[in-house]
Amino acid sequence: MSLRIMVVDDSQATRRVVSALVGSRWTVCGSAENGKTAVKKFMELRPDLVLLDLGMPDIDGIEVGRQIHAIDASTPLILFTLSDPWGLEAPARKAGFTHVISKSEPWKLLDSIKEIVEGLERGHDEASGDTSKHGRSRRDGSVN
């Protein structure tokens, strides 16, 4: 699956590094340096996934995620932060985030994106009635 990802971080260096990291496997369709720009670009680009930094100068990443989730609740959101991710799980999930990842563990970012891609592919297969991978057809409930 060709996943289109938008990267949002106030640090240009972080945007570049993360874009290079995820861009080696998927398409980085855009980036933003603050929350207001992120919401605007989200509406223009309609990426398949949004990767958001927590600490931005205008609007924090959780609020940006909440706004994006209100526009399109089907778009997966990943919070990528220097803060302790454990304390952010509950508010992030409530705002619509699927994953909270520490910037000190970038390999977890790739694993989370892979997990999201697999989930999107499963959803596409089920919606189209493709039962070759999962053994059940959504249309009639029968087993292959």
Task: List each model region and its residues.
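The feature encodes the CheY-like receiver
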Residues: P57, P85
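Active-site residues of response regulator receiver
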Residues: D53, T81
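Conserved phosphotransfer cores of two-component systems
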Residues: M43-L45, Q67-S74, A95
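Acidic di-acidic motifs
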Residues: D9-D10, N34
